[in-house]
């Protein structure tokens, strides 16, 4: 009995020691915090500088210009850098990679992106500070996260704490509109993941005390229907049938009734054209239709998106959609095609354990526990491409609101704290 009590007491003390270590900063970690604090204003000024360079995905020169700013900054902290060009026919700027190659601790892959949804013709172009809020196009999604990465690493470098670390930074140039084929546009990112132990994504934070252990994947779909062009007086007759628009209506209604409802599975028809003739421009996501009320529609097309938490869920949904499309109304035809975009990042045990390490850092800094964010409320991101190869977290970037809108903001009150947390977290991971 006495031996059992001693054994149980030793386990308790061991766990208590781990808890206390999680709640206390070491002397070195306190120096890291102080160093980050010394760069607080500089980090905000750098954020303003890169925000004021338009880098909409299709503004290739703008994306490269933002990449050059980060390239120069990483070189000053002794990272080797390279720009990965994309083939001209892909019409994408390319990606920035920066790395140091030591042999201590976990091999880290830090992911961001240089492009934004705000193209060169957007009226929202400049950084404007109002007290602790910065109105910033692409500042929250996600130049703020890129700056978090840079200044966390800068603090560690200045304290000579990166000497033996192995870290790769990957800032893609087409996250908002991924270049196709993905086998080319994401090859270097995936290769970097295969050589790493952990991937950390710095997409916008969903809350100071949240991080992302899972993200839904994204896929495109297109339904095309065909009907018999005829005078509308004969619609529904055996000779004329229902027409292309009624067939499309049937399909979309059955999608809603029969595919909808599974947790984390959503699908959305984004645009719909129908009539005698339709013309759709994919690059502009717009089109036109011509038809008359006294003519049965001969064609219709809808483009949509599908979001899912696993490949199994995606394929099951696709199978249901195909079966629905195949069951035609009289004298109509229909086809459905799918386009892969982002894979899913599943909520693995390893990701949950990594979240606990981040939470320990947060508590040690006095910021409180970090919990997992609901994947059903997040979109897709680049970290999903590497989730099959490494454990990871996302949502570690800047806080703000209004992403992808003319009211996009960065919360400067929390900006420095997030850099502190990242710097200490990276330090601990490179010492594991």
Predicted regions and their residues:
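Short, flexible, mixed-charge acidic loops at enzyme active sites
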Residues: 119-129, 214-218, 282-287
